From Swiss-Prot:
Physiological role: One of the primary rRNA binding proteins, it binds directly near the 3'-end of the 23S rRNA, where it nucleates assembly of the 50S subunit.
Keywords, comma-separated and alphabetical: Methylation, Ribonucleoprotein, Ribosomal protein, RNA-binding, rRNA-binding
Pfam families: Ribosomal_L3 (PF00297)
GO MF terms held by the record: rRNA binding; structural constituent of ribosome
Protein name: Large ribosomal subunit protein uL3
Name of the coding gene: rplC
Lineage of producing organism: Bacteria, Pseudomonadati, Pseudomonadota, Gammaproteobacteria, Pasteurellales
Family recorded in the similarity comment: Belongs to the universal ribosomal protein uL3 family.
Organism: Actinobacillus succinogenes (strain ATCC 55618 / DSM 22257 / CCUG 43843 / 130Z)
Amino acid sequence: MIGLVGRKVGMTRVFTEDGVSIPVTVIEIEANRVTQVKTLENDGYTAVQVTTGSKKASRVTKPEAGHFVKAGVEAGRGLWEFRTEGEEFTLGQEINVDIFADVKKVDVTGTSKGKGFQGGVKRWNFRTQDATHGNSLSHRVLGSIGQNQTPGRVFKGKKMAGHLGAERVTVQSLEVVRVDAERKLLLVKGAVPGATNSDVIVKPAVKA
């Protein structure tokens, strides 16, 4: 089963019949329109390419416009691809949120919020050094970053200060709380990566 592209609306909570509060993220999943079907013969693998939402005509490049016209669909805000295994799709077909009606858990992929250049304490959860006891300058610095003449260098991958966030993140096995096909909404338990209104990819959970 393929996934769908949606938009993170925000977080709220829903109550069970027992009065238990469940924190949920609301994901709006408008119809995903098929723009290309990739086959083993033509492309070397099988996949389906989709778009969703809309884009101003002035923002659509000529190659994009031709691609959308060929598929017979309205220009969307992007193109996404999902590998397929045996599923049949046709150009222009619309795939809706109700495909998750019988799914218990999903994996959600998004781009995490960018936080700019951050130090080791925020970025890697390093401990801070002593507030006093002779320490007047090095409260939040890394400390030692290696040895001496051997190896005489800092190992690659050493955790240091640097750019935090704004990277692709997947949160796995989030419970599906509600599928509202009429309003095109999917409610999942817990938080998903990204800012409000950012695009997210929702797939049936790999580890479910």
